[in-house]
Regions:
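N-terminal capping/small domains of soluble enzymes
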Residues: 1-95, 101
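Alpha/beta enzyme core
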Residues: 31, 35, 90, 102-213
Length: 213
């Protein structure tokens, strides 16, 4: 049976892909999962510089799932290119790199760096807060969605996946904005914002107060 799919011109052997943030950069799960059986490995988010992530506790169990507020902890693009990409290239699977940033310039720096790397697609995480616009997430403003999509496309060699935030009134508006900016693929969705209160301690269950469900 043919299981291959074409994603923005990239041929995947099957449509099974990992979700960014749940699978590290592949090495962490390679003892438990045969990576070459996957259509693609989608890496944890990588930024232009190392990010330490949020203070602990970062994870809380809730009814029917869990909340997490890792804070996109990552080693930065230099370490990622030197360590993680060579590891993934050992396996016959496509590589999708998730990109995060605090400013448009941060995203573009990572995207430009990846033009010379053997990766297949780039997934742009626009749920990150835009520090130049008061901290509102890029993905919550259609003008910002279109603008950042258009900007990263200027630097990208690989097809661009725009990963949309569900924490908006109308996600179709954001999808149209990404399409207008030149997105090749849309990824729906990033995590839903949630909160858990420890009623015994009368405190938030995670240090960041809110997390992704």
């Amino acid at each position: 049976m043919k299981t291959s799919v074409n994603l923005a011109g990239v041929e995947l052997k099957n449509p099974v892909m990992t979700a960014s943030g749940t699978f590290g950069s592949g090495a962490e799960y390679s003892e438990f999962v045969d990576l070459k059986e996957l259509g693609a490995v989608v890496t944890k988010g990588v930024a232009n510089v190392p990010w330490p992530g949020n203070p602990t506790p970062r994870i809380a169990e809730v009814y029917g799932g869990m909340l997490n507020a890792i804070g996109l902890q990552n080693p930065g693009i230099d370490v990622f290119c030197e360590r993680d990409i060579p590891f993934l290239k050992q396996f016959d699977t496509k590589i999708v790199v998730n990109v995060c940033g605090r400013t448009t310039e941060d995203y573009c720096e990572v995207v430009e760096r990846l033009t010379s790397e053997p990766v297949d697609l780039l997934e742009i995480n626009i749920s990150c807060p835009n520090v130049k616009e008061g901290g509102i997430a890029f993905g919550q403003d259609p003008k910002a969605v279109e603008a950042i999509t258009r900007e990263v496309k200027k630097y990208a060699k690989q097809p661009i996946i725009m990963k949309l935030s569900p924490n908006v009134t109308d996600i179709t508006e954001m999808a149209r904005a990404a399409e207008a900016g030149g997105a090749d693929v849309l990824s729906l969705i990033n995590t839903l914002t949630g909160m858990k209160i420890d009623i015994e301690r009368q405190k938030f269950a995670i240090a960041n107060k809110t997390g992704g469900m």
